């Protein structure tokens, strides 16, 4: 004997899903049904379950009217023992704002208590197993379910309509502790994708008009022109940034935005570049975001911090250049060539001034001078580092 709370936004298949998962098995097992779900079609149910209509026992309570809501609110006064209660929009029956004083109006008369009826609302839900009642409740939001019911239920069932990602008639069913909302990943006990059989929708009237439509958010992503356009723009920006399209003459028209030759002589002052003597070309002419990092109008922002893009950084006594990458303990490590040898970027973790942020494809990285609020956009030169040992000598003069 259980209390099931099925909840989800309108159109998330909570009623049809609960009917399919809870009500039909109860009917098949011969249970007496007490429900407020309108327009149940017994003939279609019987055909689907392969049983006779005469074997289906359903008691309908019209909760669209106040008298019906009060009757259902006191179900333990009169409900047959071992009945299955299927109550739609339970927040209308027992609003969560009801106080202990309000609920006393639902208390059982002494003569019914003498007939082994629960004496109060709280006792009815706490002892539903004792009386053989299974109770299935649906609501748009589990917050609309009274706390005393949630405490007795233990488990909630959250519905999410997968039509929002183009998969009509499917929903994700997440089980969770009824004390929480089920909306966080950490709340989920189990998660399943389910598809409701089409005959289920013809077994009841989901609206007072008898007509219902799937969520308008159910347009498939690959059919939405705005989404396709957005994906196209994002793809071009990432390609422009990560795959060197800003250096391709086909895209640049052969302008001087290309990186200078790697064969040029080292600069006289200590700078950071993508190769010895080369100049880092900052992507200042376009804007995009990767996670918390955004590039726009010649500036790089990371969270609340803002840095001006520059062509080089002044680093005392030595220059740093990206020389390649190396697989170490299954982790891709970018090295820098210094006067002391090749230094992994991990050593920058101990720096108060300089920080290094690799971008997702490790083709580029950003070096931040936190004191000067400057950022240098650097492209990784492929190949092995000059030295593989981690030479830390003299690094204190930098960091």
Swiss-Prot record:
Key words of the record: Enterotoxin, Toxin, Virulence
Tagged with keyword Phosphoprotein: no
GO molecular-function terms, A-Z: toxin activity
Effect of residue 100 to A: In strain: 569B and 86015
A Pfam match: Zot
Protein name, as recorded: Zona occludens toxin
Function: Increases the permeability of the small intestine mucosa by affecting the structure of intercellular tight junctions (zonula occludens).
